[in-house]
Amino acid sequence: MELDECSPSIFIISFIFIAISIAILRRIRPKKTKALPPGPWKLPLIGNLHQFISRDSLPYKILRDLAQKHGPLMHLQLGEVSAVVASSPEMAKVITRTKDLEFADKPAIRAIRIVTYDYLDIAFNSYGKYWREMRKIFVQELLTPKRVRSFWSAREDVFSNLVKTINSANGKSINLTKLISSTTNSIINRVALGNVPYEREIFMELIKQLLTAAGGFKLVDLFPSYKIIHVLEGTERKLWKILGKIDKILDKVIDEHRENLLRTGKGSGENGQEDIVDILLKIEDGGELDHDIPFGNNNIKALLFDIISGGSDTSSTTIDWAMSEMMKNPQVMSKAQKEIREAFNGKKKIDENDVQNLKYLKSVIQETLRLHPPAAFLMRQCREECEIGGYHIPVGTKVFINIWAMGRDPEHWPNPESFIPERFENIPYDFTGSEHQLATFPFGSGRRICPGISFGLANVELSLALLLYHFNWQLPDSSTDLDMTEAIGIAARRKYDLHLIPTSYM
């Protein structure tokens, strides 16, 4: 009886206790979050940065090794930055094709913000109206196939001087790396800035200093909330100082172009043709852009930065590695030389069509870019929350596509570490990341694919064709081996300059 009388009270009290407990637990227990991609264990504060503490290891090799343990889509915590690394063609295709719009942004990098005049360029500007207008300028005005062909005389002239310089070595060892770098810089400068007078050597040295200071991963980008790092690192002060000197030169070059256009109505390029600055000035004056998109000197300089920094470095690095690989694989060099010398035999002057018909040389270039992509990573940033392979990718996540690792993936490339151009003989000469080429796309894919592919490849093709046509090559000091070590950094360059002895074929 006593039990019956107290039962309702006990029931009510128990119910209230349970209800309150559930409410408290709901508040305390974190909401279930969608799963991020798997990844290695993390340390407090620094996350996965300890994975990169190595004197000799290259970052893209470290990420390749981590991906072999954790999968082709991997999450890393880089200080305060949440990052995802894609290491397979399948994952890369989703990011650059299937979900291209969701990943159309580029990560914010403080050094790049400075050198591009607050992201007024195309390579690092966020996806939006301004970016679309600038890309349209590149694709429809600056680097159309017709425009690239119009630069032939400048390329021909500069490479002719290169051949003369190498001939003058008279069988002595030359630093081919420096010669090629200087040559590609000269081509880019003539195409972009024309023949107006300016301090060319000083300008290119400043560009080199700027790229060195701005390159690599900076602590300020990994710990953006720690303002003290901005002061202690000192990079920004150095960049502003260098950029101030570059500004003076470029402003003078742009003013010279304006005056020449007004005075003569002609461009400042080869034989009165328009160069890049001339075209950009006409766009500025022609009112072709929407009225809400300002376009002045800083916009022009930012676009020039993309062309000068991207064009010369990409081409020279590719040529350097192609010659290195052919020295390591003499049978490849012999086969390429045979093709070129048969095609050019008896010709006093080489034209662009002659170069375009060199199929084996193109296979050599494809194989070089597979093993040695000039940029080891493609960088993106998630602008819309989405899922990849069942994993959640939050807005703002930095994305790194490991192109270097993709090119050496044994699942897609038999004998991946071997230099075998023949593997590309039945694969179209295509670097757009299309279906048949997704196992490697060194120039990107989708909306943010490099708009200067045809221009860069034209420089690489002509340079290699002339080097292999005019000269036989050997290593200095009867060396039997060539050091192929890569430089530490995010770009896959040679660590040591390539020194070779040329002998005139003719």
Curated annotation (Swiss-Prot):
Give its E.C. classification number: 1.14.14.-
Q: How is its activity regulated?
A: The enantiomer (-)-vincadifformine acts as a competitive inhibitor.
- Expression tissues: Accumulates progressively in roots.
Taxonomic path: Eukaryota, Viridiplantae, Streptophyta, Embryophyta, Tracheophyta
GO biological process: one example: indole alkaloid biosynthetic process
Tell me which parts of the chain lie in the Lumenal compartment: 1-4
The cofactors required by this protein are: heme
The record ties this protein, via CDD domains, to: CYP71-like (cd11072)
In which pathway is this protein known to take part?
Answer: Alkaloid biosynthesis
Q: Could you state a single Gene Ontology molecular function term?
A: heme binding
**Identification of the protein by name:** (+)-vincadifformine 19-hydroxylase
Substrates-to-products reaction catalysed? (+)-vincadifformine + reduced [NADPH--hemoprotein reductase] + O2 = (+)-minovincinine + oxidized [NADPH--hemoprotein reductase] + H2O + H(+)
In terms of domain of life, where is this protein from? Eukaryota
The gene is V19H
